[in-house]
Structure formats: structure tokens, C-alpha cells
Curated annotation (Swiss-Prot):
InterPro entries associated with the record: Uncharacterised_Ycf15 (IPR019645)
Record's subcellular location: Plastid, Chloroplast
Annotated gene: ycf15-A
Assigned keywords, A-Z: Chloroplast, Plastid
A GO CC term assigned to this protein in UniProt: chloroplast
Chief location of this protein within or outside the cell: plastid
Full protein name: Putative uncharacterized protein ycf15
Organism: Solanum lycopersicum
Length: 87
């Protein structure tokens, strides 16, 4: 899990958004404006007891303990989407 959180960039399809996993924060960015529209403390991510699946990859499931109302307020997608590594 620590390796996943310390990764750098992932591309989120079908939107032009990016999930940025950086030290201490998880942030979703719009690639066109580079505007961060949601951040989650890494400790909250690691301590989640009842996570809600938001994103999956072919290798990893990225899980957040964020309910639908909180996701809606943050403007986060409610469905599950595939993301892949970029370099």
C-alpha cells in the first residue's frame, strides 16, 4: 500500500483528470488547468476501515473511505473507472 501511495502520476479515463499521489496527500487534478479539486490526507487513506471503491487499475484497487454525499460535495466521480500508469 505504501508503494501505491508514494507513486507519482496516474491518468484517469475517460476524463482529462489525473490522480496525483504525493507525499502525505492524494489529489485529483484536471490536466488542462492543473486545478486540484480534491485532496485526501495519506493517513486517512491508509487508516480506512470501511473503504469505498472509487478507482481501480489492472494491478491495484484504490480505496477511499468516502461516502457518496462527501464525494458529491467534492465533485468526485461516483462510479468506478480504470486508471493506468503514465511516465
Amino acid at each position: 500500500m505504501e508503494t501505491l501511495v508514494s507513486s507519482i502520476f496516474w491518468t484517469l479515463a475517460p476524463w482529462k483528470n489525473m490522480l496525483l499521489l504525493k507525499h502525505g496527500r492524494i489529489e485529483i487534478l484536471d490536466q488542462n488547468t492543473m486545478y486540484g479539486w480534491y485532496e485526501l490526507p495519506k493517513q486517512e487513506f491508509l487508516n480506512s476501515k470501511q473503504p469505498v471503491q472509487i478507482f481501480t487499475t489492472k494491478k491495484y484497487w484504490i480505496l477511499f473511505r468516502i461516502g457518496p454525499e462527501r464525494r458529491r460535495k467534492a465533485g468526485m466521480p461516483i462510479g468506478v473507472y480504470y486508471i493506468e500508469f503514465t511516465r
